[in-house]
UniProtKB/Swiss-Prot annotation:
This is Putative transporter MamV. Keywords: Cell inner membrane, Cell membrane, Membrane, Transmembrane, Transmembrane helix, Transport. The keyword Hydrolase does not apply. InterPro entries: Cation_efflux (IPR002524), Cation_efflux_CTD (IPR027470), Cation_efflux_CTD_sf (IPR036837), Cation_efflux_TMD_sf (IPR027469), CDF_Transporter (IPR050291), Magnetosome_CDF_Transporter (IPR053436).
Length: 333
């Protein structure tokens, strides 16, 4: 999947397939860890299975948001449904934080009450399988997210990386508990909770950034600026900004050009710039370009050059003064 960006239809197929695979993988891991955690007596593995069940539910919502964001724009939503993926990512982040807080409370209270037990040795294999599966899913989803620019899939990738790290913490706790440190299993579960809490906060904050029209990455903006400087050195960039709209971006560009450029030339330049920017940045699907005259040209066009023009200007001033209401005069009289 590495290389040049895929075509939009291919991107959507790959993105949808990744969302389905992620959801059912979460369900399979949840069932597997629950069964093995109960049979082996590992509290950390049982706590981790609850997190996986929560993953399954949130990823179902994630899949629905990915499907909804593919709907074409209409009169009600002229820019499309892309931002629904930020809502989905926000829900995933909040759900992760809520589940982590519950898991943290559960293990702290059990550890404080002294209700600890040593897990069986086969719990080690469950933690290993969980860590390996989560890491593979993370790499696959991250690859898909980088090509499709999907915030929902990127959130799912980060979630799986958190699962991989937390599974390693569970593995360490199980091994230490078997070797004689009985409380290690619960301490590992507490560490898992704190890690998942942090991942959820990062996902939630990034989604809020997108919902509040956060800027596209600064290096992408710099790339567009360099593109203009390289191919159109006679055009000055007055303002260049971009915002995230789910998988796509909106780029707002204000350029300063000579007042001698005709309207037809402006239209031709606009089409050329839109095409060039779209080729370099495939996710820039909404490009708005405005032109203003260069400062020196603007000053020249504002100068009144002939006596006839001066007389006409004075006549307009007198006419406007005659039509002005008395209450609006400068001295109030």
């Amino acid at each position: 999947m590495l290389g040049r960006p895929m075509k939009p239809s291919k991107c959507q197929e790959c993105r949808d397939r990744a969302a389905w695979l992620d959801m059912f993988t979460a369900l399979a891991l949840a069932v597997f860890k629950t069964a093995l955690g109960v049979l082996s007596g590992s509290m950390a593995l049982q706590a981790h299975s609850l997190h996986s069940f929560g993953d399954f539910l949130t990823k179902g919502i994630n899949l629905a948001s990915v499907k909804l964001s593919s709907r074409p724009a209409n009169s009600a939503f002229p820019y499309g449904y892309g931002k629904v993926q930020f809502l989905s990512a926000n829900f995933i982040g909040i759900s992760l934080m809520a589940g982590a807080a519950a898991m943290l409370w559960y293990n702290v209270t059990h550890l404080g009450s002294g209700h600890v037990q040593v897990p069986e040795v086969w719990a080690v294999f469950g933690a290993l399988i969980s860590a390996g599966t989560a890491e593979l899913m993370h790499r696959y989803l991250r690859c898909v997210a980088e090509h499709t620019n999907s915030p929902a899939i990127m959130a799912a990738a980060a979630d799986n990386r958190g699962d991989a790290y937390s599974s390693l913490a569970v593995l360490a706790g199980i091994v230490l508990s078997i070797l004689g440190w009985v409380a290690a299993d619960h301490l590992a579960a507490i560490l898992v909770s704190l890690l998942v809490l942090r991942i959820g906060a990062v996902i939630a904050w990034d989604s809020i950034h997108g919902l509040m029209d956060g800027s596209v990455p600064s290096h992408r903006i710099d790339g567009i600026r360099q593109l203009l400087a390289a191919h159109h050195p006679g055009v000055s960039v007055v303002d260049l900004r971009g915002r995230r709209m789910g998988e796509t971006w909106e780029v707002d560009l204000q350029l300063s050009i000579s007042s001698q450029v005709t309207v037809e030339e402006c239209h031709a330049l606009t089409r050329e710039l839109e095409s060039r920017i779209a080729r370099e940045e495939p996710h820039a699907c909404h490009i708005r370009i405005r032109f203003i005259p260069q400062s020196g040209d603007a000053t020249k066009t504002a100068v009144i050059e002939t006596a006839a023009a001066v007389d006409e200007f004075a006549y307009l001033v007198e006419a406007s003064a005659a039509l002005r209401p008395l209450g609006h005069s400068r001295n109030g009289g």
